[in-house]
UniProtKB/Swiss-Prot annotation:
Protein name: ATP-dependent RNA helicase fal1
Subcellular location: Nucleus, Nucleolus
Keywords linked to the UniProt accession: ATP-binding, Helicase, Hydrolase, Nucleotide-binding, Nucleus, Ribosome biogenesis, RNA-binding, rRNA processing
UniProt short sequence motif Q motif, positions renumbered to this chain: 25-53
The organism of origin for this protein: Aspergillus clavatus (strain ATCC 1007 / CBS 513.65 / DSM 816 / NCTC 3887 / NRRL 1 / QM 1276 / 107)
Name of the gene: fal1
Length: 399
């Protein structure tokens, strides 16, 4: 567990995986560059997780790869290590491109690549919206081996010819379910059109609904699959509960009651819209509760500063939209409250996966009005899980 990956159930994971995939039990067995191995060990990894031991070698062989694994299993390091193995740092041109659905995730991936590539003199730039375009242009003109970005800004930089694509050999789509939802689909096609025809494509996500798998056929050739069966995807160690609140207006009082009874280390409260986030934040502050909030419409600098405060533990309770739910590592989070149930059932696992990340125990509490009962049952069926009514002693479960 020192390396931050929960391996307790690796032996029980069922892999619906291509026949040709072999397991590499150690990083040495993957025949990685010496400088990369040094970075991997310095980062704190000792041995590969289940998904790493299956996917890295296939990606390094140049195979198009679909890797599905739950939060906290080392997905980001899977493609980061693969990228660092295949790039040539002597050529200062962009050779790998990673697309993510949120700016925070793109920035986090950049920091993982820089850390793992610490002994390789690698250049990696986070190319994201909401930041200074001039800085992007300067960094890209200087030459970056890897670019981690959001689809809109990356497509823009390619169109302006600052992000040169002729040397790109790998495209990674992280959190592919969210990326390929309607919002980003066109922008991904835009980017893909500019890439060399032989570009390798790697798709990584905790959830891969069938329509997404279907779509990947458009830009993947005979992909290798490393898939964890879906009903394994509700994270063990997370206790899931619901509170019946009958009416929407009662949710606020319920939340205030919870504040008094729970001694929380850190908590995230999810709402479905940015307007609701702002409204709830104001209401909580009026009631003298200290909370911070974040959503996609905030300026990037403000979002960065809120994330940093939360990471460092300076702020204890964060109210957010789903922009926060995707892949952000904050290890102290022990409680997630779905003030609103997610409108997209795939987002449920991304939200609650936050609370038990890296094998930490966590509690997820869903506020359920009479209108929400059907959605809750749908989530239970989809993930083959059981969500019980919250017991009185919920504070004990967090301690």
């Amino acid at each position: 567990m020192a390396d931050g990956i929960d391996r307790r159930n690796d032996d029980r994971l069922e892999f619906s995986t291509s026949k040709e995939v072999t397991v590499a039990p150690t990083f040495e067995d993957m025949h990685l560059k010496e400088s990369l191995l040094r970075g991997i060990y310095a980062y704190g990894y000792e041995s590969p997780s289940a998904v790493q031991s299956r996917a890295i070698v296939q990606i390094c062989k140049g195979r198009d790869t679909i890797a599905q694994a739950q939060s906290g299993t080392g997905k980001t390091a899977t493609f980061s290590i693969s990228i660092l193995q295949v790039i040539d740092t002597a050529v200062r041109e962009t050779q790998a491109l990673v697309l993510s659905p949120t700016r925070e995730l793109a920035t986090q991936i950049q920091s993982v690549i820089m850390a793992l590539g610490d002994y390789m003199n690698v250049q990696c730039h986070a190319c994201i919206g909401g930041t200074n375009i001039g800085e992007d242009i300067r960094k890209l003109d200087y030459g970056q081996h890897v670019v981690s970005g959001t689809p809109g800004r990356v497509a823009d930089m390619i169109r302006r010819r600052h992000l040169r694509t002729r040397h790109i050999k790998m495209l990674v789509l992280d959190e592919a379910d969210e990326l390929l939802n309607r919002g980003f689909r066109e922008q991904i096609y835009d980017v893909y059109r500019y890439l060399p025809p032989a570009t390798q494509v790697v798709v990584v996500s905790a959830t891969l609904p069938y329509d997404v798998l279907d779509m990947t056929t458009k830009f993947m050739t005979d992909p290798v699959r490393v898939l964890v069966k879906r009903d394994e995807l509700t994270l063990e160690g997370i206790k899931q509960y619901f509170i019946a609140v009958e009416k929407e207006e009662w949710k606020f009082d319920t939340l205030c009651d919870l504040y008094d009874t729970l001694t929380i280390t850190q908590a995230v409260i999810f709402c479905n819209t940015r307007r609701k986030v702002d409204w709830l934040t104001d209401k909580m502050r009026e009631a003298n509760f200290t909370v911070s909030s974040m959503h996609g419409e905030m300026p990037q600098k403000e979002r960065d500063s809120i994330m940093q405060d939360f990471r460092q533990g300076n702020s204890r309770v964060l109210i957010s939209t789903d922009v926060w739910a995707r892949g952000i590592d904050v290890q102290q989070v022990s409680l997630v409250i779905n003030y609103d149930l997610p409108t997209n059932r795939e987002n449920y696992i991304h939200r609650i996966g936050r609370s038990g990340r890296f094998g930490r125990k966590g509690v997820a509490i869903n506020f359920v009005t009479s209108d929400d009962v059907r959605i809750l049952r749908d989530i239970e069926l989809y993930y083959s899980t059981q969500i019980d009514e919250m017991p009185m002693n919920v504070a004990d479960l967090l301690s």
